[in-house]
């Protein structure tokens, strides 16, 4: 089986969301879904908002990133989460 590397873009609900706590929550979520977190970074967006990017490594399987993406979208402080890059290694 191949290894999948995905970049997930996560938008918090507001600028008041604690950035480091959100990054730690996302890292734990990835690792609790049989995947490895290869990095979490943030970029300023506008008006105090920021975007968080999560690099995920996992074995290729049916359903792919869907369970992780859905779990991220279900988090209380997350407005949206979507896979923006996907590649096989």
UniProtKB/Swiss-Prot annotation:
InterPro entries: eEF-1beta-like_sf, EF1B_bsu/dsu_GNE, Transl_elong_EF1B/ribsomal_bS6, Transl_elong_EF1B_B_arc. GO terms for molecular function: translation elongation factor activity. Gene3D superfamilies: 3.30.70.60. The keyword Protein biosynthesis applies. The keyword Protein biosynthesis applies. Keywords: Elongation factor, Protein biosynthesis. HAMAP family: EF1_beta. Promotes the exchange of GDP for GTP in EF-1-alpha/GDP, thus allowing the regeneration of EF-1-alpha/GTP that could then be used to form the ternary complex EF-1-alpha/GTP/AAtRNA. Belongs to the EF-1-beta/EF-1-delta family. This is Elongation factor 1-beta. It comes from Methanococcus maripaludis (strain C5 / ATCC BAA-1333).
């Amino acid at each position: 089986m191949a290894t999948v590397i995905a970049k997930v873009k996560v938008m918090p609900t507001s600028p008041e969301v604690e950035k480091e706590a959100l990054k730690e929550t996302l890292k734990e979520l990835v690792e609790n879904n049989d995947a490895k977190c290869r990095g979490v970074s943030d970029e300023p967006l506008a008006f105090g908002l920021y975007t968080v990017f999560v690099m995920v490594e996992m074995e290729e399987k049916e359903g792919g990133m869907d369970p992780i993406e859905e779990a991220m979208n279900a988090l209380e402080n997350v407005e949206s989460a979507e896979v923006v890059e996907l590649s096989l290694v």
